[in-house]
Regions:
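Sec-dependent signal peptide recognition
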Residues: 2-8
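Alpha-helical cap/lid subdomain in secreted, periplasmic
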Residues: 106-231, 243
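Bacterial signal peptide processing site
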Residues: 19-21
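Conserved SGNH/GDSL esterase-like catalytic core that processes O-acyl groups on lipids
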Residues: 48, 52, 58-136
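C-terminal motif of bacterial Sec signal peptides marking the signal peptidase cleavage site
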Residues: 14-17
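Short hydrophobic segments within beta-strands
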Residues: 52-53, 157
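N-terminal low-complexity, Pro/Thr/Ser-rich intrinsically disordered segments
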Residues: 26-48
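Conserved catalytic region of serine esterases and O-acyltransferases that act on ester linkages
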Residues: 220-228, 232-291
Length: 291
């Protein structure tokens, strides 16, 4: 399993974000509000979704894989593509997959849109402290996609605080990364917010009686330099994706592809949800409330 620990220079990132933070309370005033959703085109045949991101899209668990399995369990046809490179921002993900990306972006579909949905996840350093670059990267990639998918619905991935919930500045950086994601949504046509950060924050704060500590260990995220979603977090994210895109609660499969652990010899494989997830119902409710 690919578990290279990604070094973001996190101290410098947080220091920069701290210096650029506003003191306004407006950052978190819309935390509990339901965000507007983009309008997806009417697809002929199976719709197609593209995931663009780095290790928060796929590391210990895979958002594209879990979303595909949840769609299948709900008899929801879906073709899934992904452009994923660990530890880099959107423009570098594009550069890393340029040939594949250009080939796919040039494809057409009989309904007029090759892609129906696109999920865009920016790197934590950029999403947290470089709003201008964040907006420019999203504009660059959406402009390319819209050439043959003019009506595609875009979802901006709201990142998580890079700090542990126990850190005194966790909430400050949660607010900052959320504020920037909302700013990107506001400048991106036909886009909405995929509220991963909000959902994870709710789970940490015990919504629906969820308890993130299991045997005194964080059951949502794990990492040394970067905190990545574990099975509980991946389950939450998968349910959130379905609820956000289709505006309904998913029927969750009894088995999902989840991680066997966090060691170098661990991997992803199909597992019993009842055994691998600490509180599925609570996580499903948290996901639905953040759609």
């Amino acid at each position: 399993m690919r578990k290279h620990f990604l070094v973001f220079g996190i101290v410098a990132i947080l220091f920069s974000a701290c210096n650029n933070k506003t003191t306004s309370t407006e950052n978190s005033t819309v935390t509990s509000e339901k965000m507007a959703h983009p309008k997806a085109p009417k697809a002929e045949g199976s719709p197609r979704i593209l995931f663009i991101g780095n290790s928060h899209t796929e590391f210990f668990v895979s958002a594209p894989v879990l979303f595909g399995e949840i769609c299948k369990a709900n008899n929801q046809p879906m073709i899934i593509d992904q452009l994923v490179t660990m530890g880099v921002s959107i423009e570098k993900i594009y550069a890393d997959h340029k040939k594949e990306a250009e080939q796919n972006f040039a494809k057409t579909d009989k309904d007029g849109n090759y892609y129906d949905y696109v999920v865009i996840q920016e790197s934590t350093p950029v999403a947290l402290a470089e709003l201008d670059k964040y907006q420019a990267n999203v504009k660059m990639i959406t402009d390319k996609i819209r050439k043959n998918s003019p009506d595609a619905a875009f979802y901006i991935y709201e990142g998580m605080s890079p700090l542990p919930i126990t850190d005194s500045e966790y909430k400050d950086y949660f607010d900052e990364i959320r504020k920037n994601a909302i700013a990107v949504v506001e400048t991106t046509k036909n886009s909405g917010l995929l509220r991963v950060g909000d959902a994870v924050n709710d789970a940490y704060n015990g919504k629906n009686d969820y308890k993130y500590l299991v045997a005194n260990k964080d059951n949502l995220r794990f990492g040394e330099n970067t905190l990545h979603l574990l099975n509980d977090g991946g389950y939450l994210q998968g349910a959130l994706l379905f609820a956000t895109i289709f505006d309904k609660k998913p029927i969750m499969p009894k088995e999902l592809t989840l991680c066997t652990g966090t060691g170098d010899n661990d991997d992803m494989k199909k597992q019993d949800v009842g055994k691998a997830i600490s509180n599925p119902k609570a996580l499903e409710e948290i996901a639905f409330s953040n759609r």
